[in-house]
Curated annotation (Swiss-Prot):
InterPro entries per UniProt: Globin (IPR000971), Globin-like_sf (IPR009050), Globin/Proto (IPR012292), Hemoglobin_b (IPR002337), Hemoglobin_oxygen_transport (IPR050056)
Chaperone in keyword set: no
Domain of life: Eukaryota
Gene field: hbb1
Keywords assigned by UniProt, alphabetized: Heme, Iron, Metal-binding, Oxygen transport, Transport
Self-association and partners: Hb1 is a heterotetramer of two alpha-1 chains and two beta-1 chains. Hb2 is a heterotetramer of two alpha-2 chains and two beta-1 chains. HbC is a heterotetramer of two alpha-1 chains and two beta-2 chains.
Protein name: Hemoglobin subunit beta-1
Length: 146
């Protein structure tokens, strides 16, 4: 994947402005609520019976934060995203058996949460760059499935 200087700056700026403790839990909670079949991978997280329970679940919040810190690795290594996610791809495919389509669903939920947070700053150009970045991450995480 080729990245322009503008795209690199946009991704760095977006992630530099995000409060991971806020955005991470919101994105994962949204994914679990909007796509309830994704909950099957989080059985050890306890009560996920309804939206209120999911939003208030500390394990969901902690994992959402962990996901954003994982994305931070990609931000800092934009030229080697597939390589830095190789082990994580193996973990999710071989041990956890996560449906690779779920990565795209979570990426879509993250896009919505970031757009809501950024407001008018999340213009079409910014969105295009953000979604390009997430598409590369999703592809890297799904690499072991192919």
């Amino acid at each position: 994947v080729e990245w322009t200087d503008q795209e690199r700056a946009t991704i760095s700026s977006i992630f530099g402005s995000l409060d991971y403790d806020d955005i991470g839990p919101k994105a994962l909670s949204r994914c679990l609520i909007v796509y309830p079949w994704t909950q099957r991978h989080f059985g050890s997280f306890g009560n996920l019976y309804n939206a209120e329970a999911i939003i208030g679940n500390q394990k969901v919040a902690a994992h959402g934060i962990k996901v954003l810190h994982g994305l931070d690795r990609a931000v800092k290594n934009m030229d080697n995203i597939k390589e830095i996610y190789a082990e994580l791809s193996i973990l999710h495919s071989e041990k956890l058996h996560v449906d690779p389509d779920n990565f795209k669903l979570l990426a879509d939920c993250l896009t919505i949460v970031v757009a809501a947070k950024m407001g008018s700053g999340f213009n079409p150009g910014t969105q295009a760059t953000f979604q390009k970045f997430l598409a590369v991450v999703v592809s890297a995480l799904g690499k072991q499935y192919h």
